[in-house]
């Protein structure tokens, strides 16, 4: 079966992989091609377009591997060995150091983590099995690798701004939903989520309604304040005049 091992959790705190079978690689529907074009992104095929669409819609870069090219049906997230080489999708070959993060199969590199996929594992017209990737890679490492190699992409630029581990799961669910909506594959139950849970928990914010009104300079009813925060997905607790709120992960 498919396995995922994260050997460098300090550079990849969360990695989600999901297997899709019976894949039919084809042109994306017109509505998706139009939306991508409006954002300056060329349509490639339905599978790759799903990953690009999600990056634009949610802000989470994704990648799709042709599963048949992954030795041992394995994903290993690890630091590169000194002078290890990878050829990326654009045909460029890079010599790496241990500062660079790789997505590998059981034997060889399959992608330069967060920057670009490897040439060997790209989605082709004949691809029938896909492994979707949604991950959080640390922005400092992506920036350092991108500058050192002189290689950047839409994905690396998004990662350099910082990605929340919460978004990683949302993006994968959205990708699988689009696979079903476009009818381009069968979503299996084979999904693996490696979460090192290194994200700091959101600290509760405690204050009073009186102080909120003093800062605002207007009077807002207690119930209205509570209602607004709850509609913004804050976890709110009220006790007499004091209010405690915990922000959702994406509002840290």
Question: Model-found features: residue ranges?
Answer:
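RNA/tRNA-interacting regions in translation and RNA-turnover enzymes
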Residues: 1-252
